[in-house]
Regions:
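Beta-rich, blade/repeat-based domains predominating
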Residues: 122-133, 166-177, 207-219, 251-265, ...
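C-terminal motif of bacterial Sec signal peptides marking the signal peptidase cleavage site
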Residues: 13-16
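Edge beta-strands of extracellular beta-sandwich domains
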Residues: 68-70, 91-103
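A short beta-strand motif characteristic of beta-propeller blades
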Residues: 113-119, 157-164, 199-205, 243-252, ...
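Conserved beta-strand positions in repeat-built beta-propeller and related beta-rich domains
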Residues: 138-142, 182-187, 224-228, 269-274, ...
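Beta-strand-rich domains and repeat architectures in extracellular enzymes and scaffolds
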Residues: 115-147, 161-174, 327-329
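A short helix->beta-strand "capping" segment at the edge of beta-propeller domains
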Residues: 102-123, 153-159
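Short loop/turn segments that connect beta-strands within beta-propeller blades
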Residues: 151-156, 194-198, 235-239, 283-287, ...
Length: 341
């Protein structure tokens, strides 16, 4: 009897261990190594790396039901969630697998033409730049030096300035509905100012976004970068993050998205991704990188000094149909026309 009891215990342990070692996963196979919206994929279930047959199998991509063989045209660019529901050995299972979907086309290469140069305070650690009524507004960074500035760039005249408390590191800014929105870097807080008086009215906290980098608007919502591959869409009234897009090329996600400007449904964003002064032209709806502008030569045209830093200011002037570009501790602002090659 004692031997049978021990055999029974061994059997229980064996069954338990067998169940613990059962690793289910979703298999996603395709002819292409990199998924894009034209990819056709086959979805299956694997158990311990072997394909198996299951019952009541259903697949979903971002909660939309799909067939086992499906086209990724319904997917969004960036991260996508694949869910499987099925029954195996009389047990109901739910699995989740994330895949990345990239842009179908390579980015176009853009060039630029310098059509003007203007003085810029060489001491300013520029973090954000935007025009309103032909007046340039600038946000600057560094703890103890961060500020919000109102500037007549054509006459080299500082009109007004507001300084942040020393604990705050200023970042991007944008202007919408007669309000100035300004970010801070790691404090996870932003500030709202009255456009006319430049007096601070209130602050707001970040949601899921990790940090504050760049800020822009499309006339309806705010668009905020946080140093990752994501740009967050924010309701300007509730200040809640309502959605996000992920920035991708045909091969990779692009992180370190920084200063932003939105023109004609395109987001112009500078990035440190390529270790040079580059601005990406991004589809505002999908996150695809449609173009790349290499501004690397601009830094050679400003005064060279030990504290000279990267390009980090881009503002569009609607009246002149041109962009104004500067950088951290640059002594010039460049007016440029962007040319699609």
């Amino acid at each position: 009897m004692r031997i049978n009891f021990y055999l029974f215990l061994i059997l229980i342990v064996f069954i338990s261990c067998s169940n613990e070692n059962q690793i289910y996963e979703i298999s996603v196979s395709s002819e292409s190594e990199i998924f894009n919206k034209e990819s056709k994929v086959s979805l299956d279930i694997k158990l311990n790396n072997f394909l198996i047959k299951v019952e009541d199998l259903k697949f979903f991509i971002n909660e939309k039901k799909v067939s086992k063989v499906t086209n990724l045209s319904i997917a969004k660019l960036g991260s996508n969630s694949i869910k499987a529901q099925f029954t195996h050995n009389n047990q109901k299972k739910i699995l989740i697998k994330n895949i990345d979907v990239y842009n179908t086309d390579q980015p176009n290469l853009y060039s630029y033409e310098i059509i003007g140069e203007y003085p810029h305070d060489i001491s300013l650690y520029t973090q954000g730049l935007e025009f309103k009524n032909n007046i340039l507004y600038e946000s600057t960074g560094l703890n103890g030096y961060s500020s919000l500035r109102k500037f007549d760039v054509y006459n080299n005249q500082l009109i007004d300035v507001r300084f942040l408390d020393d604990e705050y590191f200023g970042e991007g800014l944008t202007i919408l509905n007669n309000k100035i929105y300004q970010l801070t870097w790691k404090n996870r807080i932003g500030f709202i100012y009255d456009l006319k008086t430049m007096n601070m009215e209130k602050s707001f906290n970040y949601g899921q976004s990790s940090e504050g980098w760049g800020l822009a608007n499309d006339g309806n919502n705010l668009y905020k970068s946080d140093g990752t591959e994501k740009i967050w869409i924010i309701d300007p009234v509730t200040l809640k993050e309502i959605d996000n897009i992920e920035i991708v090329t045909d091969k990779k996600k692009v992180k370190n998205i920084n200063e932003l400007e939105i023109v004609d449904e395109k987001i112009y964003a500078n990035t440190y991704q390529f270790n040079k002064d580059v601005v990406l032209v991004i589809n505002k709806l999908t996150g695809s990188v449609d173009g790349i502008i290499d501004f690397g030569n601009l830094r050679n045209k400003v005064k060279q000094h030990n504290n000279l830093d990267v390009l980090n200011g881009i503002a569009f002037n609607k009246k002149r149909n041109s962009f104004f570009i500067t950088g951290k501790r640059w002594d010039k602002i460049f007016e440029v026309k962007i040319i699609k090659n």
